[in-house]
Amino acid sequence: MEIDLNADLGEGCGSDEALLDLVSSANIACGWHAGGANAMRDCVRWAVQKGVSIGAHPSFNDPENFGRKEMDLPASDIYAGVLYQLGALSAIAQAEGGRIAHVKPHGALYNQAARDSKIADAIVSAVHDFDPSVAVFALANSGLVTAARNAGLVAVEEVFADRGYRADGSLVPRKEPGALLDDEDEVLTRTLAMIREQRVQAVDGQWVSLNAQTICLHGDGPHALAFARRIRGALQDAGIEVHAAGAARA
């Protein structure tokens, strides 16, 4: 049994280099919600040194809201914005001896793509035109998974052990009760259940089936790094191997 562990990096949380010792895939911010050229270069260099798969973490151009404000943009704008961010990170990766292996949208772009086919198709088109061998990390069971596979791309289905789920498989919005789980023992139990049983309990008590191929470890917060170490240790104790997912392993 195996799983991919990913983390969002280059966002100013300060623990990027240490997190890269724990994860198999890194989603690197491309400057539109956080980060910048130097942060991107640092994260890419560390990822190459540690053998971690490099991924782009594009977003809406919204640093004021950390990319978490929903936007209604033309598909052409979304396509161009994603392609622009991929190009920036790709240039840095090439200079450091690496390459982009996957793309995981950030924040509102990620959440809207899960339910809005126009946005999902625009992201997928940008990834396909950039490099059709690049995988797309998407919320499990979401429209972005479907769009990626329809375009012939590898879709890697992502789950969140520390986020609340609705019965339809969507994440509870961050501002609503039950959105974020802070009981570490509960999160560890959910993590193992997602991998072994391929399901998660929603906030209303219903069980949601999902295909857990990669799990996001959040790096923001005072105890995030220590908790990430607990999760990695629990997986090791359970005999679950950690490997980069999908096309990211190529």
Curated annotation (Swiss-Prot):
Subunit (UniProt): Forms a complex composed of PxpA, PxpB and PxpC.
Catalytic activity, EC: 3.5.2.9
CDD domains registered for this protein in UniProt: LamB_YcsF_YbgL_like (cd10800)
Official protein name in the record: 5-oxoprolinase subunit A
Recorded catalytic activity of this chain's protein: 5-oxo-L-proline + ATP + 2 H2O = L-glutamate + ADP + phosphate + H(+)
Organism: Paraburkholderia phytofirmans (strain DSM 17436 / LMG 22146 / PsJN)
HAMAP family, sorted: PxpA (MF_00691)
Class in the EC hierarchy, top level: hydrolase
Pfam families: LamB_YcsF
GO molecular function: 5-oxoprolinase (ATP-hydrolyzing) activity; ATP binding
Keyword Cell wall biogenesis/degradation: no
